[in-house]
């Protein structure tokens, strides 16, 4: 189950969303998914449907693995991050053994650091966290904090062009060690 890249989002969504799409994600026309595809494409990574012939270069997961009640923007509890991070997220990272982990948003980034017991000197803004770059986990795994790629964040905090720039160091980290990589 090895993958060079692991992308960690916040949560899977709601029970209503799950039931509406019969357990499958609405892959086309969902702004978050479309934006994530663009960002991944910018670093040379493509998402394929399950069962498609692929290299296993990416593993997608979330900091919270359960479904929540309410709408997709419904709040999540801090204890869900603590519980899922310790019991599920850290073991997932250890099993997948990615070279790079991308944390989609502040909450996903905090969940990863908390799962590993990493104390981080938090700057005043998440923008500064993103600008400071990656943090190393054990076994030289790099965690890159980036903004979430949902439409609301893209429209209010960090547009697509800025996010594409945020992902450039991720591309370099994935290529490091490859022949001819910078």
Regions found by a protein language model. Give the residues of each.
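A polyanion-binding, active-site-adjacent surface
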Residues: 1-124, 140-154, 160-161, 173
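Charged phosphate-binding loop/patch that engages nucleotide di/tri-phosphates or the phosphate backbone
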Residues: 166-182
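Alpha-helical scaffolding within the catalytic cores
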Residues: 124-135
């Amino acid at each position: 189950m090895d993958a060079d890249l692991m992308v960690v989002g916040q949560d899977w969504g709601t029970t209503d969303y799950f039931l509406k799409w019969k357990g499958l994600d609405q892959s086309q026309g969902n702004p978050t998914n479309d934006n994530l595809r663009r960002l991944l494409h910018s670093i040379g990574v493509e998402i394929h449907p399950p069962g498609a012939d692929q290299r296993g270069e990416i593993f997608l997961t979330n900091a919270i693995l359960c479904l929540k009640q309410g709408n997709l923007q419904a709040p999540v509890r801090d204890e869900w991050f603590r519980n899922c991070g310790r019991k599920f997220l850290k073991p997932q990272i250890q099993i997948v053994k990615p070279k790079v982990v991308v944390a989609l948003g502040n909450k996903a980034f905090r969940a990863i650091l908390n799962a590993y017991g990493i104390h981080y000197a938090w700057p005043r803004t998440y923008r500064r966290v993103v600008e400071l770059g990656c943090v190393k986990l054990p076994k030289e795994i790099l965690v890159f904090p980036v903004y979430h790629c949902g439409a609301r964040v893209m429209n209010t905090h960090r547009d697509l062009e800025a996010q594409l720039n945020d992902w450039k160091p991720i591309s370099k980290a994935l290529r490091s060690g490859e022949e001819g990589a910078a």
